[in-house]
Regions:
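Metallo-beta-lactamase
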Residues: 1-74
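Rhodanese-like catalytic fold shared by cysteine-dependent sulfurtransferases
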Residues: 2, 46-83, 87-89, 97, ...
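Short, well-ordered loop/turn elements at secondary-structure boundaries
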Residues: 17-18, 113-116, 133, 156-157
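A contiguous, basic/glycine-rich beta-loop/short-helix subdomain that forms a polymer-engagement track
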Residues: 96-107
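Conserved, hydrophobic alpha-helical core segments of structured domains
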Residues: 107-123, 138
Length: 315
């Protein structure tokens, strides 16, 4: 397939005029490709200048190597979605009817216990650290949402209960259904405030700024620093002393961590590391700090980082 792609790019795409407008099929962060830009429109001329796959002097074998090198295995929901497309799945109306089931706190608790549901808190990364339902996990709907659900929740039939800002419940359900999660069974009516008003406890995730972490690192105490970005991002550049612990494989690798140790987590900007922290806390890890602003903020401190490397195969 990579060889055929080489031919189609050179024989059908590259001969077109430079002012041809290009729209991406996928956005930055998608597992459907690598080195994808966040821009939503481009020109073929711009792509010829900056896209590694369109360099004129690249040989077939060089193209195949660059395209395939460093590719990680696809998220587990990809093949499951293929089977759903072949055999069919529930219609969106039925999924919405089931999922748009607003529950009071008592009903929500009962449904959680009886179905062994997964509670996903979809609020913002700014809100969640200050108070969320214990044992729920955070995946924010305002950021890369459905792909991370698909990567981190192995069972597409998993019953899901939703915590969402008022008025956004339907959006969450639709976005879950787009990647095959057709079993949301309801949401907490009144959200986190209803839970709080009922007198139930809230959990928190400790956070600190990059500057605060730099001061902590300067005390001489042992620091366990986890970089939860993808391996390609880590290889490009990372904080000295950080261990790569990609969020993509957290379920597989969690046993490698010691729940009695304190861990500091960072990603690119603070979103993925907060997901990781919530998942670790749901599995019994208590001594966790999320570094706000992620690597971008850490790089601006006096702490050492590796020299930047050009990784053409970055995902």
């Amino acid at each position: 397939l990579a060889s055929k792609l080489f031919d189609s790019l050179r024989n059908k795409i590259m001969p077109l005029a430079d002012d041809v407008i290009v729209y991406p099929g996928h956005g930055a962060g998608s597992a459907c490709g690598k080195k994808m830009d966040k821009e939503t429109v481009s020109t073929l001329g711009h792509q010829k200048k900056f896209n590694y796959a369109l360099r004129e002097d690249t040989t077939r074998q060089e193209f195949i190597h660059e395209l395939l090198d460093g590719l990680v295995e696809p998220p587990q929901y990809f093949p499951a979605n293929v089977l759903m497309n072949v055999h069919g799945s529930a219609g969106i109306d039925a999924i919405l009817k089931q999922g748009m089931n607003g529950m009071d706190v008592a009903t929500f608790q009962s449904a959680w216990e009886q179905t062994d549901a997964l509670v996903i808190d979809t609020r913002s990364k700014e809100e969640v650290p200050h108070g969320y339902i214990p044992d729920s996990i955070f995946i924010g709907v305002d950021e890369t949402f459905a792909p991370w659900v698909g990567t981190l929740v192995p069972n597409l039939l998993q019953p899901i209960l939703i915590i969402a800002d008022e008025g956004r419940e339907e959006e969450v359900i639709v976005r879950l259904a787009r990647v095959g999660y057709d079993n949301p069974i309801g949401y907490l009516r009144g959200g986190i405030e209803a839970w709080r008003a009922a007198g139930h406890p809230l959990d928190t995730i400790w956070e600190l700024s990059a500057e605060e972490f730099a001061r902590e690192a300067g005390t001489g105490n042992t620091i366990n620093l986890l970089d939860v970005r993808r391996e390609s991002e880590y290889l490009t550049e990372h904080m000295v002393g950080a261990e790569n612990f990609p969020l993509d494989f957290i379920n597989r690798n969690m046993s490698k961590l010691d729940p009695h140790k304190t861990y500091y987590l960072y990603c690119g900007g603070g979103y993925r590391s907060l997901i990781a922290a919530s998942m670790l806390k749901s599995r019994g890890f208590q001594h966790l700090y999320n570094i706000r602003g992620g690597y971008k903020a850490l790089r601006a401190t006096s702490l050492p980082h590796t020299d930047k490397m050009v990784v053409n195969t970055a995902l």
